[in-house]
Structures are given as structure tokens and as C-alpha cells.
Amino acid sequence: MFYTETYDVIVIGGGHAGTEAALAPARMGFKTLLLTHNVDTLGQMSCNPAIGGIGKGHLVKEVDAMGGLMAHAADKAGIQFRTLNSSKGPAVRATRAQSDRVLYRQAVRTALENQPNLDIFQQEATDILIEQDRVTGVSTKMGLTFRAKSVILTAGTFLAGKIHIGLENYEGGRAGDSASVNLSHRLRDLGLRVDRLKTGTPPRIDARTINFDILAKQHGDEVLPVFSFMGSVDDHPQQIPCYITHTNEQTHEVIRNNLDRSPMYTGVIEGIGPRYCPSIEDKVMRFADRNSHQIYLEPEGLTSNEVYPNGISTSLPFDVQMGIVNSMKGLENARIVKPGYAIEYDYFDPRDLKPTLETKSISGLFFAGQINGTTGYEEAAAQGLLAGINAGLYVQEKDAWYPRRDQSYTGVLVDDLCTLGTKEPYRVFTSRAEYRLLLREDNADIRLTPIAHELGLIDEARWARFNQKMENIEQERQRLRSIWLHPRSEYLEEANKVLGSPLVREASGEDLLRRPEMTYDILTSLTPYKPAMEDKEAVEQVEIAIKYQGYIEHQQEEIEKQKRHENTAIPANFDYSKVSGLSNEVRAKLEQHRPVSIGQASRISGITPAAISIILVNLKKQGMLKRGE
């Protein structure tokens, strides 16, 4: 039967990609439906109970800057906050929050249920309806049909998911949840390129059976960071420590003696796992020279006895998992509450997607999250937001929007996926970004909030707060530029006490702040430069902009050079077979990838600068040479 209402956007899946994908078009004013197999697991943290980290924290800030939910939920649920790389430069500093699973899920569900234009319905989707290569709706397990102008698929690990514990395996989307088998079969019929990936999770341990007294304690930061630009430290719940233990030679011996029972080492698992989050059996075999690996014991919540042992993800049999756990210091008498497991699942080649995350072959069908070959809550959330935005724009028949590589880590992520594809679970790192000095956590709002306002993603309160911050930054920079200190000043002696070398020529406040020994706090403690500004976010921007001005200007010059042809559009109907001078190999790769811009084409492996020049000449000849935004 047909459901009576027609939607603008339907989102399948209520994980980290799905929740952002549903909220974005709803905030833009589009009637949106979120289909989930279980409303009680919306925003579920299926693996590590943490948000953020190197590169990942940048994505969280970007999602927040565009009105997304993840940062707000992390602030509400974070039970230990840390700033990683705090002693390094601002480009690589990253926020991480250990999270209470229950509080996080509650924050997500509350936001979804209170969002206008958004309906939530509990049903497993089994079919995507398509007419003349255009999506028209979704069918569910109980025979309901929902009509929609666009559909976003965010199925995570559920598509033909198979769970492995030892040599035993069974269908499942994650522990306790069934797999989406029918939907997987339907998607395979669409002709999209599909393959298998694998991820895993460690056993959960009963905290009451751990001897914490003999373990090293890890506290969070004393000055607590905040994820959301609209957040406050007052949003954070009680803060608690994590603990550290280590594997040892006994642990490694248990693992080596049981590799014949490992689904990874006996060929049962065919999917490729995440390079940067390997299983403990992988670590022991790949790093055979190491006799110890550090394991973080992370609490799963303020009211839970479960502990997440970060670093021993495994698919070995349960008795072997017990041997691994009990071999470590402090865990000699520990009990496992939930066994660890590996899961294989379908993912689709992201090279079959436009940078908007719409499929190239089916209009109005978008993919986001792990089904695009990524790993991590943060990568999923960023994709969900982008897909949600473009699903809304598609409904309005407006121009699509997606960020450039020099604009955000989301832009880096999507460009890497859609241009290069991936054969293993992809995660974001700061090292993947060419212009990371410009793509910092602290300036995500400056980069993206004006765009979010233009797209209708943020409310007036956020916009007003952002504009006030920008005004504070400009006023303070003007103030520091206008106050000069000269060698005959009555304040010279006071200044020389904090300067590394005495002042010998006239200098403005900006000039003094550029000195390596000077900070904003020290500068504004000097009489001429009092008082300090109260807006700490604005202070941070002022200090970074002044101290790193030369480096920032250099990167901006590099970007302008790159932009010259980066955004030159290649029409979807461009016929490479009629371009003389291209080798058969280059022509085949271009036909396969169908890049949407010269910049994207240039990053395809094997596409030479000479080939790019030939394409540009032909675009010009055919009157197709149009610059993108």
C-alpha cells in the first residue's frame, strides 16, 4: 500500500550519517522522512564511545559550523575531553571527547524528535523505487510504499552484513541487529560497483572485575574544550578518567597459538579492514618485534559498568578473547560482558558518485557514510550533512553545492572518495589536506557558517553570534594596529621585561604579537594594550591570524594558482572518444571516472598534465570552457 504523504527527502538509516542527512533538509524546509529499523538505536555508537580525534575533530567542527548535530551531542555526552596535539601548531590540534553512549543517543533522539519538517518511522527499507533512472520512493518490509523526490541511503554496515566470532558467522548489521539482505540484493541489481569491507570491535569488559588500583590513570584536560561553536562547558556532564594497561608476551602467545581459529587468517573473511584501526591479531603479526601494545580502558558511560578496551578489536573465538583479556595487568580476573567480533558488509565504489554524493546513474539517489567506503562516525556525519543539503537542492532544482579541498576537510574527504575511490576503509587525517593551515578546527565557522546561512541551514541566533564574533575579531585587530609603542615611550621598560629582545624601533600591537615570545595574554597585560577582549574564540582568531599571517598568505596564493583550472567544469556529456591526442589508457580512465571538473580529472591516477592540457584545448574549441564558482 502507498503511504498517504509524499516526501521531499527520505533517509534510510538512523546512524551518524542518517541523522545528519535527515536534519539538514528538514532545517532547509523540506518535508523529510527518516526510516530506521529501530528508533531506540538512533545515533547509536556501535563501536568506540568517542567523538573526534586527529582530523576527525575537524570534521565535527565543520558539521557544527553548518548547523549539524554531532558537536552538540558530543558536548552533552562527553565524559572526558582532551585537546590532542595541544603543544603543536593550530592546524593539527584536535578535540576528542570520550562519550556516554546513553547520553549521546538521548541528545540525538531529542534533536530529531524536535526538528520541524522531520518524521521518523520504524521500518526496514527493502526496495528503492526507480522510474526512468530517477528515484521515486522506498518500499518497506511490511509492504508500505513511501513516495519521495530524493532518497539518501545511509545503511552503515547493515547491507548484507555478516558477523564473525571465530570460525562461526551469521547475518547481522551489528551485534543484536539483523542485516539488510533484501535491500542489498536490490542495490546490486542497479549495476553499481559493489565490494566488501570489514571492520571490528573489541569485547566489552565488566568494570567491577577490573583492578583499577594498579593501572595508570588518564585524566582529561583541566580546561575543558567545547565542540560546538554554540556550546558551553556547562553542557558537559560529570568528567571521569580512563585507564591504561598493556598487552604482553603472554597475550601475544595466546593470539599466535590460535591463528588457525581466526576468520581473518583462515580466509573466511574476505573484506579488507581499516588500516589505522587494526585488530589485535593483526598488530601482533604485523609488528612482531614489539612485545607490548598500549590499551586504553574507556568507560562507556556514567551509569554503565561496561568498559571499552581500545586497542584489542578482535574476531577470535570467545575463549581466546578471555585469554587475551585475562593476560593483561589489572584484567587478570576481568569478565567479558559482550564478545568482540568482526563484521563484513557491502560498500559501493564512491567513484560512481558525484561530489554531491548523488549517484551518477540514478537521479535523486544519494549515498552517505560507510557504504561509501569510509570508517568513523565523523566521516559518516560529514557525508550525511552534504548528502542532505544536496538532496534538498535537488528537490528545488537548484545548483548543487559541495566544498572544495581548500575549503574544508569534508571537501578533502569527498574529493578523495569520488576521484580516487578506496579499497580499504577510508579515514580522515590532517596529512590528507594540502592546505591544512587554513583548515583548522578553530576557524571552521569562518569557513562554512556563511555558506550554511545562505543555504538555510542555521537559525538566526547562530548567525547573530557568528557575526558578533567576526565584528569582535575585526575591532580587536584594528585596535592592536592603532596602538604603537616607540623606544621613547613611558611604557618601554614595562614592555622590555617581557620582550625577548629590547624594542629599538616603533612597533604596533600586531608587530609585537608576531614575536615568538609574545602571546595575546602577555600583550594585553601591558598598560598600553589593556584591556584584553573577553571573547576567547575571537582572541584565538586574532592571535593565529597575526602570528601565522605570512604562512596563511602563502597558502592562499597557492590556492589561487590551483584554482585557475580547478573548478573548470567538464560537461557530463563530454565525449572523450572524439578528443585526439589522448592515449587509450587515459581515455578509458576518464570514461570510467567521468570527472566533473579539471581539478578532479587531474587527481585521477595516470592522468598526465599533458592530457589535462588536451582536454582544456578541446573544451575551448567546443565552447564548453566555463569556470565553476
Curated annotation (Swiss-Prot):
The keyword tRNA processing applies. NAD(+) binds at residues 273-287. Its cofactor is FAD. SUPFAM superfamilies: FAD/NAD(P)-binding domain. Keywords: Cytoplasm, FAD, Flavoprotein, NAD, tRNA processing. Its main location: cytoplasm. The keyword Glycoprotein does not apply. It is found in: Cytoplasm. One of its GO terms (biological process) is tRNA methylation. It comes from the Bacteria. PROSITE patterns: GIDA_1 (PS01280), GIDA_2 (PS01281). FAD binds at residues 13-18. It holds the Pfam family GIDA_C_1st. GO terms for molecular function: flavin adenine dinucleotide binding. GO terms for cellular component: cytosol. Homodimer. Heterotetramer of two MnmE and two MnmG subunits. PANTHER family: GLUCOSE INHIBITED DIVISION PROTEIN A, PROTEIN MTO1 HOMOLOG, MITOCHONDRIAL. Belongs to the MnmG family. NAD-binding protein involved in the addition of a carboxymethylaminomethyl (cmnm) group at the wobble position (U34) of certain tRNAs, forming tRNA-cmnm(5)s(2)U34. This is tRNA uridine 5-carboxymethylaminomethyl modification enzyme MnmG.
